[in-house]
């Protein structure tokens, strides 16, 4: 089946350097029909192939020598075998005195000459065969190009490197990836002379260290047997010691220390443990009530800093005893009562500031704020209004209709004394308090100026009449807070102030 050439023209357009969209013709679309019968025929044809002949051919080729097999598939004897390549590599390794560059140049030049000679001979053969049959020349030339080996050592080495890289090998990381342990004189810091606390021949510790255990002097099996014998019951135990223990082996430090003092003699160590006056298990001495109270106060003040607790609160005990008592105290009912009173168990964020879970902290703060806040009943509007109305009623009853009080004329209330103090009950009052009623009318004009203009005087008279009618009606209660909205509670201040101001105006007119 011949393949269409690239240069052949297509119905949609000729193939040039530029890309064009493929436009199929009508004839191509007519034949573009997928028939399933053709697939079935192809499957039947493939099923008719005989695999037995292929197996026989493979078996015959397996017994065939390599030279015949190469010639069967069209390869000449010039192709080097793997065995020959290994022999050549061994010969090259033996020649250490020769220069590698000269060998490569000479080898490449000599092989290039051989290739030129072979090319010239090949060209002569091609010219002779071209006269006889042009198709044979093309096939021979293609086969020669395929079969021609690469004889230059430079290319051979590259091919070997490529073959080695293609093989599966373990990944070896680079040296930069590896971590180097910085140990040695070059990584040590140079400490100045005055910084060091100790001299060259001075000992850091005044007393010698005491050996407590050496695991190399006695095998582990004997140590286990010794610990079992040391923890064996005698039947004379009382109290807590009488409680049966598990089958596990306890690491009895006192028994091991006795074994070290006896030069790892197990029998002598067991005898000393049994007849020693000091108990094998030291019980914690009882703490007094004062010590317990001081310890709890230290926990409140310093947290779990047992060094500060011992130094400032419980000086009669050591730091180790404070730690041991803390774990016993935490399992007692005294700790539960202490935690309820001080909430010591939940204030972990004070001791560990790195904790990022602040939910417990927020709950604790909200509960403590709610408990510390004393519940006080809020002042109602009715109470404040009643108290203010009682004050105003007492002030009005102390005066007669002419505005003169029972005590004398010197206690007449001026207009400026009436001030609105209830307008800002819910908010801050202004710094400069101005009197509500002055010599101005309700529209904001002064009375002296209004007398000169008759029109303005008529308007003020009408406004006064309207104001009298409004005062006769029942006053609506109104409360004004700092934001300017109406709110109940301070309406009496405003209404009483207006009523008293009007009452004083009537007194002046009567006078």
Swiss-Prot record:
SMART domains: ELM2, SANT. Residues 1-16 have a biased composition (Low complexity). SUPFAM superfamilies: Homeodomain-like (SSF46689). Residues 1-171, 365-511 are annotated as: Disordered. Residues 179-277 form the ELM2 domain. InterPro entries: ELM2_dom, Homeodomain-like_sf, MIER/MTA, MIER1/3_C, SANT/Myb, SANT_dom. Ubiquitously expressed. Isoform 1 is only expressed in testis. One of its GO terms (cellular component) is nucleoplasm. The modification Phosphotyrosine is found at residue 154. It is found in: Nucleus. Transcriptional repressor regulating the expression of a number of genes including SP1 target genes. Probably functions through recruitment of HDAC1 a histone deacetylase involved in chromatin silencing. This is Mesoderm induction early response protein 1. It comes from Mus musculus. The gene is Mier1.
């Amino acid at each position: 089946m011949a393949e269409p050439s690239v240069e052949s023209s297509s119905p949609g357009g000729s193939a040039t350097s530029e890309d064009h969209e493929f436009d199929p013709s009508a004839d191509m679309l007519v034949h573009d029909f997928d028939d399933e019968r053709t697939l079935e025929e192809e499957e039947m044809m493939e099923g008719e192939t005989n695999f037995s002949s292929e197996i026989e051919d493979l078996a015959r080729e397996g017994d065939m020598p390599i030279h015949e097999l190469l010639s069967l598939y069209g390869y000449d004897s010039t192709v080097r075998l793997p065995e020959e390549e290994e022999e050549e590599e061994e010969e090259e390794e033996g020649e250490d005195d020769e220069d590698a560059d000269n060998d490569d140049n000479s080898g490449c030049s000599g092989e290039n000459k051989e290739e030129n000679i072979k090319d010239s001979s090949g060209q002569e053969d091609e010219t002779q065969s071209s006269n006889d049959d042009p198709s044979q020349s093309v096939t021979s030339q293609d086969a020669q190009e395929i079969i021609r080996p690469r004889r230059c050592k430079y290319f051979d080495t590259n091919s070997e490197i490529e073959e080695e890289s293609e093989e599966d090998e373990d990944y070896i990381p680079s040296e930069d990836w590896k971590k180097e342990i910085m140990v040695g004189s070059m990584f040590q810091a140079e400490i100045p002379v005055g910084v060091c606390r100790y001299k060259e021949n001075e000992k850091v510790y005044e007393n010698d260290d005491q050996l407590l255990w050496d695991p190399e002097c006695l095998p582990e099996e004997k140590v286990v047997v010794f610990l079992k014998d040391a923890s064996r019951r005698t039947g004379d135990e009382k109290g807590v010691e009488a409680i049966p223990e598990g089958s596990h082996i306890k690491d009895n430090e006192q028994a091991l220390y006795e074994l070290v003092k006896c030069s790892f003699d197990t029998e002598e160590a067991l005898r000393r443990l049994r007849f020693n006056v000091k108990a094998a298990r030291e019980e914690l001495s009882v703490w007094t009530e004062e010590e317990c109270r001081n310890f709890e106060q230290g926990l409140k003040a310093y947290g779990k800093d047992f060094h500060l607790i011992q130094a400032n609160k419980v000086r009669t005990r050591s730091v180790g005893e404070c730690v041991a008592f803390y774990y016993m105290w935490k399992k007692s009912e005294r700790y539960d009562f202490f935690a309820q009173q001080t909430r010591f168990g939940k204030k972990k964020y004070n001791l560990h500031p790195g904790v990022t879970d602040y939910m417990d902290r927020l709950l604790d703060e909200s509960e403590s704020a709610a408990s510390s806040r004393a519940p006080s009943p809020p002042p109602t509007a009715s109470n404040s209004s009643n108290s203010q109305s009682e004050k105003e009623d007492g002030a009005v009853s102390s005066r007669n209709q002419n505005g003169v009080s029972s005590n004398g004329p010197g206690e007449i209330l001026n207009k400026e004394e009436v001030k609105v103090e209830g307008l800002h009950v819910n908010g801050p009052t202004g710094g400069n308090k101005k009197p509500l009623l002055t010599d101005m009318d309700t529209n904001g004009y002064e009375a002296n100026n209004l007398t000169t203009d008759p029109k303005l005087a008529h308007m003020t008279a009408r406004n006064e009449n309207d104001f009298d009618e409004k005062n006769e009606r029942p006053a609506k209660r109104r409360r004004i807070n700092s934001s300017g909205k109406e709110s109940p509670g301070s309406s009496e201040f405003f209404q009483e102030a207006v009523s008293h101001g009007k009452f004083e105006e009537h007194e002046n007119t009567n006078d």
